[in-house]
Swiss-Prot record:
It is an enzyme of class 3 (hydrolase). It comes from Saurida wanieso. Inhibited by the serine protease inhibitors Pefabloc SC, STI, aprotinin, benzamidine, leupeptin and antipain, and by the cysteine proteinase inhibitors DTNB and pCMB. Its EC number is 3.4.21.-. The lineage of its organism: Eukaryota, Metazoa, Chordata, Craniata, Vertebrata. This is Myofibril-bound serine protease. Serine protease which degrades the myosin heavy chain but not actin or alpha-actinin. Selectively cleaves Arg-|-Xaa bonds.
Length: 10
């Protein structure tokens, strides 16, 4: 969990 794929769909 670092890229942000689990936070935002961008």
């Amino acid at each position: 969990i670092v890229g942000g794929a689990e936070c935002v769909p961008y």
